[in-house]
UniProtKB/Swiss-Prot annotation:
Extracellular metalloprotease that contributes to pathogenicity. Its EC number is 3.4.17.-. InterPro entries: M14A-like_propep, M14A_act_pep, Peptidase_M14. The lineage of its organism: Eukaryota, Fungi, Dikarya, Ascomycota, Pezizomycotina. Binds 1 zinc ion per subunit. Substrate binds at H179, A180, R181, E182, R237, N254, R255, S310, Y311. It comes from the Eukaryota. Its cofactor is Zn(2+). Keywords: Carboxypeptidase, Disulfide bond, Hydrolase, Metal-binding, Metalloprotease, Protease, Secreted, Signal, Virulence, Zinc, Zymogen. One of its GO terms (biological process) is proteolysis. This is Probable metallocarboxypeptidase A.
Length: 422
């Protein structure tokens, strides 16, 4: 393998995307301001007055504000927050991104092993890796082109089964990278796919899980946005679908599902990172994913859906749209969340908080978890925010990929064992 810069790794697919010059974050800082009752309104005003981007916006006291500050605003920002406690997440965001995006180029046909998880990778290399991984286990897996993104990219999936054969068991569905900048989710979902395949008939717990469930893993739910983060803007979140009569492209795919679509947990502003779209379910990729989930459900049903995100170290249950409503299966969701968090922590000591989405992180409208539970009638619908809690945020160093994969696999195995046991 040879080291190359991500900007040289342009996708080989021919797509109808406009060329956008790479955004340079050199000199930008990411600063955390913990909020309290006496400063949360002022922090909100500072963000608005200086027109600053945030990784985490403080909607109420006690929440952290993770703020991206450009070089031109650093002096004004530091003056405004004088006297407040702060934590420096990235002294130079551009340098952090350059360190993170020194990819290891992947040679197609390579026998996948743990070395894949020592680096982040280009979109095209992910496609090659997934096909090579499946090629090692042809009798109990398939690589699936699940559909096309708005710009024509493949939405890849791995379908894994055990002794009962293909489509013979209730399904488990894992989604990663619905938000383009959350690269660790791509790698962790692939780590689980690699483990389910390579450890079958070697690890008793994994063998039992694969024999009891039909497993579908979609590591890159939002391929256009993901590719855009690698060539143009590392911190892009949405898809790349144009919005009529608006200068800002993209919708937040996790605000676009057609259930409880309108509310304070999403935005009607096309320039917002949480823009819900013009109509419920109008995202190209959402149409693909809904069609796939319905097709999977038509076999033996869906036992569990998990949407993997970053960052925050959280494992959460429905609902996102309401902070007071609870599903009838709330107790079971909470029990499994605790099992996941306890088993995960036992690996590297990483603490996770658990609870309903709205109460644990923030209110969300039009999200995948609520849609899967209430519309598709998935039995168990959950979501995670992977490492970290904000020391590095979305730009997580590559040396955290393997430990993130190890602990997430342990939590997932423990949780699925509990599902099997009933």
């Amino acid at each position: 393998m040879r080291s190359v810069l991500s900007l040289a790794l342009l996708a080989a697919n021919v797509v109808t995307a406009a060329v956008v010059a790479p955004f340079d974050y050199s000199g930008y800082k990411v600063i955390r301001v913990p909020t309290q009752k006496d400063n949360v309104k002022e922090v909100q005003r500072i963000i608005t007055d200086l027109n600053l981007d945030t990784w985490k916006y403080p909607k109420s006291e006690g929440q952290n504000a993770d703020i991206v500050v450009p070089p031109s605003q650093i002096s004004s920002f530091m003056e405004r927050i004088s006297g407040m406690n702060i934590e420096m997440m990235h002294e130079d965001l551009g340098l952090s991104i350059r360190n993170e995006t020194s990819f290891e180029a992947y040679s197609a046909g390579y026998a996948p092993d743990i070395n894949w998880f020592k680096s982040y990778h280009s979109y095209q290399d992910h496609l090659s890796y997934l096909q090579d991984l499946q090629g090692l286990f042809r009798t109990r897996s398939e690589y699936v082109d699940a559909g096309k993104s708005h710009e024509g990219r493949t939405i890849p999936a791995l379908h894994i089964w055990g002794s009962g054969g293909k489509n013979s068991k209730p399904a488990i569905i894992f989604h990663g990278t619905i938000h383009a900048r959350e690269w660790i989710t791509t790698m962790v979902t692939e780590y689980m796919a690699w483990s389910f395949l390579s450890q079958y008939n070697k690890n008793a717990d994994i063998t039992s899980i694969v024999d009891n469930f039909d497993i579908w893993i979609f590591p890159i739910v939002n391929p256009d946005g993901f590719a855009f983060t690698q060539t143009s803007n590392r911190l892009w979140r949405k898809n790349r679908q144009p919005n009529p009569n608006a200068r800002c492209p993209g919708r937040d795919l996790n605000r676009n599902y057609p259930y409880q679509w309108v509310g304070p947990g999403s935005s009607s502003n096309p320039c917002s990172d949480t823009y819900r779209g013009a109509q419920p379910g109008d995202g190209t990729e959402i149409k693909v994913h809904i069609a796939n989930m319905k097709k999977i459900a038509a076999n033996k049903g869906i036992a569990m859906f998990v949407d993997w995100h970053s960052y925050g170290q959280l494992f959460m249950s429905p609902y996102g749209y309401s902070c007071t409503a609870r599903p009838p299966t709330d107790a079971r969701h909470q029990e499994l969340s605790r099992i996941f968090a306890q088993a995960l922590k036992a690996v590297h000591g990483t603490p996770y908080k658990t609870g309903p989405i709205c109460n644990t992180i923030y209110q969300v409208n039009g999200d995948s978890v609520d849609y899967a539970l209430e519309v598709l009638k998935v039995k168990l619908s959950l979501t995670a925010e992977l490492r970290d809690t904000g020391a590095r945020g979305f730009v997580l160093p590559a040396d955290q990929i393997i430990p993130s994969g190890e602990e997430t696999l342990a939590g997932t195995v423990a949780m699925l064992k509990a599902v099997i046991q009933g």
